[in-house]
Design a protein with these regions (language model features):
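Solvent-exposed, flexible loop/coil residues
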Residues: 5, 19, 38
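RNA-recognition motif
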Residues: 38-44
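Short amphipathic alpha-helix segments
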Residues: 14-32
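C-terminal structural segments of small proteins and small subunits
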Residues: 53-76
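Short beta-strand-to-loop capping motifs
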Residues: 12-15, 49-54
């Protein structure tokens, strides 16, 4: 991947409540590889979308795990 190339990573999560969202927010906000992120709580899968540079899905899954959040990559 080109150093300047952005990638969108998409995950199914259990970010159903504001409290769960607050648990992961510091991890995502402070990570240098994450450009921006959002959660679609209107989707049944509480989809987490991350715009990143040089991050693998496993990196995000590990961040979520560290925050106590369930997270799995959604296929394209």
């Amino acid at each position: 991947m080109n150093q300047l190339e952005k990638e969108i990573l998409v995950f199914k999560t259990d970010l159903e409540t504001p409290e769960r969202l607050d648990a992961i927010k510091p991890f995502l906000d402070q990570h240098p590889g994450i450009i921006k992120w959002n959660v679609d709580n209107h989707d049944i899968d509480n989809v987490l979308r991350i715009e990143s540079r040089n991050m693998a899905p496993a990196d995000i899954i590990e961040l979520a795990k560290d925050a106590g959040i369930s997270c799995e990559e959604l296929p394209d």
